[in-house]
């Protein structure tokens, strides 16, 4: 759906949905120790569809498929390698069914999620094959775009995913986690393991986090049409958006998290309220963010509040 990119070029605002995995957990869907929320595609797919429907009712312009942790290297490690095709096809089908079921007065796009979840111990050749496989399945299943959600590096792994995603011919948006170091430089990665040691997960870095500017310079020329900050501390979003604007002149966006990770579950503690989330989102909009949504801990109430504040 290249119309999304055209809408961004026209300066329009787009509302992304909120969290998938943590919202499934919130309503009682068990998380897998290895494959996290992908397990829901096997055990309780109807609840995945209902979650998508709720985001549509809340006002989302874009639905994200439950495929964040559904690449082959993740599912094989969880003993579900034979379900790669089925889970990815099913995830797209459920999002499409939700779109068909809920009549809304706007065009709704479906974004196929790809990530580095569980991939840090996978060699480059396997990652290339696995990302190619997942990108092709998502494209064949009918997603309108691919959303690369990378909560850390190494950059070479993101490059591999980018090239495979772009090769489908679909629009690709790149989302990166960022934290701000003591020198006020934005770095690629997740602040949690840098400070308190919390938020540890299969996405965490195994080496020093590179500057975000380096990541942008290497990755955005590969063909992404938008750049977003994902799964980052809310107070790091503004300086991250500023760093993005210094190194990229295209559309930018933000969907940070609220809460804390103690795998395989999200801890809904120290949560920002939907009302306060809207207030900080207004600052992101002033910084030029055209795309806003939510990551872990940010559910349908937040999306509903964002829609009321930014009717589009």
Regions found by a protein language model. Give the residues of each.
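Domain-level signal for soluble alpha/beta catalytic cores
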Residues: 1-312
